[in-house]
Every structure is written in structure tokens, then in C-alpha cells.
């Protein structure tokens, strides 16, 4: 099973929000943001800060994808 953050990037487009703006609002470092872009693991704390900054639920920014 792997995590996908495609929903996060779609949400940013829908909100017309720049990556730098989210990083500042959620207090997320550039290296952590690149982990998200590359589908790598990040801490739950980071995900919750992003949800708080975007006023959304965690299911709106990520999904679990089963490997076949």
C-alpha cells in the first residue's frame, strides 16, 4: 500500500494557492514539501498542520492506494 498526495496538489490548484503560501501557512519546510511532491512519507503532524491551514479533512489531501 502506498500514500498519494495528489489530492493535496489538486486542492491547491482549486484554491489558487501557491506552494510557498501553503508552506508558510502550515509551517512546512521546503524539504518536507518536496517529500509530499515525491510521494514520500511525512509525519502525521505535518499532515495535520496542512489540514489546519487549508481548513480540510485529511482525506481531502491524501489517499491510500493498494498495490496489486
Where in the sequence are the language-model features?
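Short, basic-rich loop-to-helix N-cap that marks the start of a DNA-contacting helix
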Residues: 40-52
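Short C-terminal boundary/hinge segments that cap the last helix of small helical domains
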Residues: 55-68
Amino acid at each position: 500500500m502506498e500514500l498519494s498526495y495528489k489530492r493535496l496538489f489538486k486542492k491547491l490548484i482549486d484554491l489558487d494557492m501557491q506552494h510557498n503560501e501553503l508552506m508558510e501557512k502550515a509551517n512546512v519546510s521546503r524539504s518536507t514539501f518536496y517529500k509530499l511532491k515525491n510521494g514520500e512519507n511525512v509525519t502525521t503532524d505535518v499532515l495535520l498542520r496542512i489540514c489546519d491551514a487549508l481548513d480540510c479533512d485529511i482525506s481531502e489531501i491524501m489517499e491510500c492506494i493498494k498495490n496489486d
